[in-house]
Amino acid sequence: MKEKNMKKNDTIELQLGKYLEDDMIELAEGDESHGGTTPATPAISILSAYISTNTCPTTKCTRAC
């Protein structure tokens, strides 16, 4: 039984050393997402602009608030 466990551990150790650090950095840099916005961001921006415009549309109103 110990022999089987040692063989499993040897296999795991070999898998851990499969990639070099440079390979991992290359993989990580290749998977980056450009922009970083969520699909909800444009809708939230439009809603915020609408509320802002209809709540206090002028600087005179803003000062009165």
From Swiss-Prot:
Entry's Gene Ontology cellular component terms = extracellular region
Any single biological process term in GO:
defense response to Gram-positive bacterium
Its post-translational modification remark reads:
Maturation of lantibiotics involves the enzymatic conversion of Thr, and Ser into dehydrated AA and the formation of thioether bonds with cysteine. This is followed by membrane translocation and cleavage of the modified precursor. It is not established whether the 2,3-didehydrobutyrines are the E- or Z-isomers. In the NMR model they were assumed to be the Z-isomer.
**Record GO terms (molecular function):** signaling receptor binding
**Renumbered to this chain, where is the cross-link Lanthionine (Ser-Cys)?**
52-56
Residues that bear 2,3-didehydrobutyrine: 38, 41
Query: 2,3-didehydroalanine (Ser): which positions carry it?
Result: 45, 48
Q: Which domain of life is it from?
A: Bacteria
What does the UniProt function comment say about this protein?
Lanthionine-containing peptide antibiotic (lantibiotic) active on Gram-positive bacteria. The bactericidal activity of lantibiotics is based on depolarization of energized bacterial cytoplasmic membranes, initiated by the formation of aqueous transmembrane pores. When present individually lacticin 3147 A2 exhibits weak activity towards L.lactis strain AM2 and L.lactis strain HP, and no activity towards L.lactis strain IFPL359, but when combined with lacticin 3147 A1 it displays strong activity towards all three strains.
Q: Tell me the protein's name.
A: Lantibiotic lacticin 3147 A2
Naturally occurring in which organism (per UniProt): Lactococcus lactis subsp. lactis
Gene of this entry: ltnA2
